Amino acid sequence: MSKRLLRSLLSLMVCMAMLLSLAPAALAESANAPSTEMAVGAVIHGFEVVENGEFTLLNAKTTVLRHQKTGATVFFLINEDTNRAFDISFVTPLSDDKGIPHVFEHSTLDGSKKYPSASLFFNLIYQTYNTYMNAATYQVMTTYPVASLSEAQLLKYADFYLDSCFNPMIYEDESLFRSEAWRYSLESADSPLTISGTVYSEMQGAASLETSASYNAMKAAFPGSHMGYNQGGEPTEIPSMTWQEVKDYHTAYYHPSNSLTTVYGAIEDPAAFLALLDEAFSPYEAKAFDFSTPDYAPVTSPVEKVCQYPVYEGTETENAAVTYITFICENATEEEQNVLDLLTMLLSDSSSALVSNLVDALPNADISVYLETDGPEPAVVFVATGMNEGDVQTLRECIYASVLEFAENGVSQDILDAIASSLTMETALMSEESDLGVNLSLIHISEPTRQAEIS
């Protein structure tokens, strides 16, 4: 998934629905025709319609609804895409490197009160009529998307996901925690005591110089915030996690008031999804959430940090360093962030002065530039590989000189036209993608209509 698609994940709340009092023939004529009973202020299965609109890029009618009892947000995008999708997402902040959100993501789909089978999730993936079924943990949220060509099947998957999220078996079965998180293993009396577990093993395999450099860079740029933590969990920290911590985390954040539900595609009976959601949400009372970062201490002067990464003896270390240079863009407005996003594209272009200057100064180095928006403040991040620790000053001078040249001379119209053409084509092809509904699981919780357009 591209960084641009992941832009702005840190808010969460708004949605839609369609009450089907229309005749089936009318629905067949237009899958996205809005019901006259979906006017703003209408209440359907405990959800109040708060916004109606259109998403022309996807040829979709949009509706945002809010659950009257809990404040949970539901977002419908109704169009003629038969690859229908359902998703529920929660803001799941990080406070350490144990990987608790990741472990719970795995444990969630290990069975629930209504579906008490640890193997059901995999049976559904491989033996039922779905086109996508998964879950994912990101820096600021955990999301549970599923897609199907059958609306009836999608409704059943939604029921499975909702019960799994709100009534997981892990509360009663510690073995699920031990299986997914970590446990001690002893193959024989003479064997050494080892640690195993699905998430522990997964994160051992995912550990790399590049990922370590990324987390260390964000920790230095945003000290005290969630940005420096590994959402998947650090293998050295995962064994300090307890079963009680995982249960407490679920109690704290898996709540309807902290959720965004998205339903996408040729949905003929939105009311059925609303009835299902109302059943899942109604046992809860409204709850306020505060995702401020009181421990965040903004940097006020340049910070330099060198981190070591262990490698096997004999590993080639020449030109093997990864360097991050990050510029915090404090209080950048949304418009300014859009400009910065375009700037990073221009600087990353193979014909840019930055790339050209770097090739001359450090022939083995590669560089990329992106706008980071998941942190407390937006930041422009330069990432260089294929260099040595002693080359940092040369890299810094290349960046400064290139940005200054860009500011003084601008960019050629040919390059602007090429990028504009590329973006236009990318946008035009978006509606042809097969996983549009699944990708919508990455939108913000606070303003889904606007965030869907950004994505």
Model-assigned labels for residue ranges:
Residues 61-69, 303-314:
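Short acidic-hydrophobic surface loop/beta-edge motif
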Residues 78-120, 124, 334-347:
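Active/ligand-binding-proximal structured segments within catalytic/core domains
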Residues 32-42, 107, 111-298, 319-324, ...:
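Charge-rich, well-structured scaffold segments of protease-associated domains
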Residues 20-32:
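Sec-dependent signal peptide cleavage junction
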